[in-house]
């Protein structure tokens, strides 16, 4: 029984290693020449596997590309969550804007793969990534500081940060000052300032006696 379990475990590890090799080969080709140039034949040659092996693990070319892109989204989301967000929800959104751009500039190949492909239906990994932004915006709404509906604010903020990131990666280089200006303008437009703390109106007994 132990021998059988060991054999199953070995096969699972080998299968996972094969999938990882195929995904790495696919990512390298996509990064170098894009989706249109990708062929199963070249993936096979680079990964050292046969076409039936790829179809067994991933189904078809479209599903294979989806898996590569999803892995990029998972890494992206993990990176954005790696550092604790500030306690103030507006500052958390501001910090998220900066971290988003930092990731895109540090991983331009992954970023292009994530957003260069047209999708009829976003995958769970892509939706989970966007949901992180939506939750930050919802936290602002929860304390009464959002000027517009959550969905509209999240979409507008994402358009802004994606635009800055994409332009910078493409070589237009709007620069950090312009990025901060866009970030702060969006926050000013979408959110309300924090209310000032109320001062207590209760006079101290000693103060009352002194004024009598």
List the predicted regions and their residue ranges.
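Short alpha-helical functional segments enriched in proximate histidine and acidic residues
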Residues: 29, 79, 103, 136
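Short, basic, alpha-helical segments at the C-terminal edge of helix-turn-helix-like DNA-binding modules
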Residues: 70-77
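Helix-turn-helix
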Residues: 21, 25, 29-63, 67
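N-terminal intrinsically disordered/low-complexity leader segments
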Residues: 1-17, 28, 196-212
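Short coil/turn segments at alpha/beta junctions that flank glycine-rich nucleotide-binding fingerprints
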Residues: 32-36, 107, 143
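Hydrophobic/aromatic-rich alpha-helical bundle segments in the mid-to-C-terminal region
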Residues: 112-116, 122-130, 140-187, 197-206, ...
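Pre-recognition alpha-helix immediately N-terminal to the DNA-recognition helix
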Residues: 21-29, 75, 95, 99
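Hydrophobic alpha-helical connector segments
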Residues: 67, 81-110, 121, 130, ...
